[in-house]
Amino acid sequence: MTANLTTLANLRAGRLAGATHLDLRHCGLDEFPREIFELADTLTMLDLSGNRLRTLPDDLPRLRALRTLFCSSNLFETLPAALGACPELDLVGFKANAIAHVPADALSPRLRWLILSDNRVAAMPETLGACRGLRKLALAGNRLTALPASIGDCESLELIRLSANAFERIEDALPDGLLALPRLTWLAYAGNPFNVAQEARALAATPIARIAWDELQLGELLGEGASGHIWSARWRPAQGGDRPVAVKLFKGAMTSDGLPGSEMAACIAADVHAHVIGVEGRIAGHPQGAQGLVMGLIPPRYRSLAGPPSLASCTRDVYASELRFTGAQAHAIARGTRDALAHLHAQGLMHGDFYAHNILVDDDAHALLGDFGAASFLPVDDVPRSEALKRIDRRALSVLIDELTQRCDTPDALAELRP
């Protein structure tokens, strides 16, 4: 019996009184266990992901302490309206269901974080604008053709994912009200009908080596992200030579940021820069037809500047508590990543996920910017909108500079680098 099935058995036996967290993932549930209501006064986090649920009970608001609910990878076709009446609920995750309808009353004004990635949502209700405290909104991989006009009222919104939807026009995906939001800092919109042709042109126009799969020998798995696996490898070109590289093989599935094909187009278009993790070539002839890239192997002396946001921090990276920088180190990291961002903008790209956890640094404070999963091509024929998008990226740079300043022994060292 798995740990979660043991938890379910204990729940049904009444042995979890006072529990605050309940993990019932992959328990084969097709109905909401009514015994959960026995924890109504204490339960703050409930995870029902990976089951066969289609509905939640109408009396869900009886869970008066519930703040976080995950129901990803179930069979929901409608976002349950009862969510909107839960008195403390502020984080809702329903990724990878079959949700086509979001009722107006399903969105609580208390929402801080809403995840609806990889569903079938064609429209969001105007009540979205009442979510004045909403900071993070994940809508990639749906069927949206427009955003509600009220999106401009989401004054706390910092991160939004709109990639891989059905937006035919850029003004429907990126309305002026959205781009004018004062705190919007991380934005992704690749893989929509209005920009897929631009992505294809970029792939076709960018000169890049085609590296045969049989020239590569995979080594150890270095890491796994939402879009793929990264391996160490040896590259032995047919003309001779042997050198270490990294190989990224894309999974080919929807991620929280968008489609792997969009990420690959952005990686290639990013070209070469001293502070950007570069691409050596595109893999050809993979036996299963997988798409992949060959990249330079990053020396082990490089490490992530920070960890990704937590459930509590929402949109802010989590740094090691003891991490400190000299003024020179902080300045070098900020200057290098600023230059990397300016390079991407010059290449016609918005990074969209400019975060410390996507930056590698070594002991000499040399920084490398990576992870193009949320990158999008700038609309070169729409200068005002393009400039607005660059400003959003630069707002993320300001956040990074603030975070470095907080951990720097000479905070004034970074003043000149602020956008």
Description of each model-found segment:
Residues 278-291:
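Short beta-strand micro-motifs within the conserved protein kinase catalytic domain, predominantly
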Residues 341, 345-361:
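Catalytic-loop of the protein kinase fold
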Residues 333-334:
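Activation segment signature within eukaryotic-like protein kinase domains
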Residues 1-58, 67-81, 85-115, 172, ...:
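The feature captures the LRR N-terminal capping module
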Residues 368, 372-418:
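C-lobe/activation-segment region of protein kinase-like
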Residues 219-225, 230:
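Protein kinase glycine-rich loop
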Residues 229-266:
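ATP-binding glycine-rich loop module of kinase domains
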Residues 288-302:
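Conserved short submotifs of the Hanks-type protein kinase catalytic core
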